[in-house]
């Protein structure tokens, strides 16, 4: 799941 998919956007930002 990548940010491009729009599903892990929040997770990526939280990381």
UniProtKB/Swiss-Prot annotation:
Induction: Expression shows a diurnal pattern of oscillation across the 24-hour light-dark, with increased levels during the light period (at protein level). GO terms for biological process: photosynthesis. It is found in: Plastid, Chloroplast thylakoid lumen. Its main location: plastid. Keywords: Chloroplast, Electron transport, Photosynthesis, Plastid, Thylakoid, Transport. One of its GO terms (cellular component) is chloroplast thylakoid lumen. Monomer. Belongs to the cytochrome c family. PetJ subfamily. Functions as an electron carrier between membrane-bound cytochrome b6-f and photosystem I in oxygenic photosynthesis. This is Cytochrome c6. The lineage of its organism: Eukaryota, Sar, Stramenopiles, Ochrophyta, Raphidophyceae.
């Amino acid at each position: 799941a990548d940010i491009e998919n729009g599903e892990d956007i929040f997770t990526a930002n939280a990381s």
